[in-house]
Amino acid sequence: MSAMLQCMSHTPLKGYFDPAADVVEEVAALAAAVREEVAHFDPEVVYLFAPDHYNGFFLDLMPQFCLGIEATSVGDYQTPKGPLRVPRALAEACAGAVIARGIDLAFSYRMQVDHGFAQTLVEVLGGLARYPVVPIMINAVAPPLASFQRARLLGAAVGEFARGQGGRALFIASGGMSHNPPIPQIATATDPEVIERIVAGRNPTPEARAARQQRTVAAAQAFAAGDSPLRPLNPDWDRALMKRLCSRDWAAIDAYRNDEVSAAAGASAHELKSWVAATAAMESATAGQWDARERYYRAIPEWLAGFGAMSGLGRHP
């Protein structure tokens, strides 16, 4: 089989509150280059690991990992709304194989995904339904959270399944890097409306979604101005993790502890478990016969995130 890895940050703030024009152009050029590589590779199936932000998954039932057998984008921020092109039989087989490997993977025949999936599908693939995609959600916002090691084992199980299928497989990770956006937590929330939104906030009105999005924009504006209680970005931490992923230093990655990650890089740095899972999938699918490269990093306060990208290409006889 042939395999490709593409890991890239996402940001809901793109187009709402942007950094300087040259930075916007730099990131757009990165996305265009990745799309061109993907088009040339022409994957037969895509395995996309990404988080949710209380838009598709809620505290009434929050899995650590969930594979979508049918999935639809909710269309938050400026992402398109509509169905993903999920190959049902393949997704069902993947879920079964991963569970057989000892990973307690949830699955959904009516999965809703947000910008964490949709923005990456558009920017990396060129659209929600351009290629067959198996979407896999990794909980990164609602403690208690699975460990980095469990994310690796999830990815390894997916990669082993993909290797057995053969063909051209693309593994994508969306999320990160260091960031600490104003996502409410059940442990500290006091407003009944906020609590209800994170427990069972499916299908909000357009007005409610717009108000939530405006609060995120306001938080980004304050953060960029240096007038925010949000945790600072941590470029050194981000670069160290990328380096460990590129070298496949699994012992170091397995040693990451959730509380230490939150303290060093912010509560939403756990989105990088998507990168860990996708990289582990690539490693397993190719039996280690692949090359990785760090291709981009910039701390972008306007987007409330360290923005990074890494890629890989390999094959297994």
Swiss-Prot record:
Reactions catalysed: 3-(2,3-dihydroxyphenyl)propanoate + O2 = (2Z,4E)-2-hydroxy-6-oxonona-2,4-dienedioate + H(+); (2E)-3-(2,3-dihydroxyphenyl)prop-2-enoate + O2 = (2Z,4E,7E)-2-hydroxy-6-oxonona-2,4,7-trienedioate + H(+)
Keywords, alphabetical: Aromatic hydrocarbons catabolism, Dioxygenase, Iron, Oxidoreductase
Active site: H115 (proton donor), H179 (proton acceptor)
Enzyme class: oxidoreductase
GO terms under biological process: 3-phenylpropionate catabolic process
Its EC number(s): 1.13.11.16
Subunit structure: Homotetramer.
The protein's name in its UniProt record: 2,3-dihydroxyphenylpropionate/2,3-dihydroxicinnamic acid 1,2-dioxygenase
The species this protein was found in: Azoarcus sp. (strain BH72)
Encoding gene, per UniProt annotation: mhpB
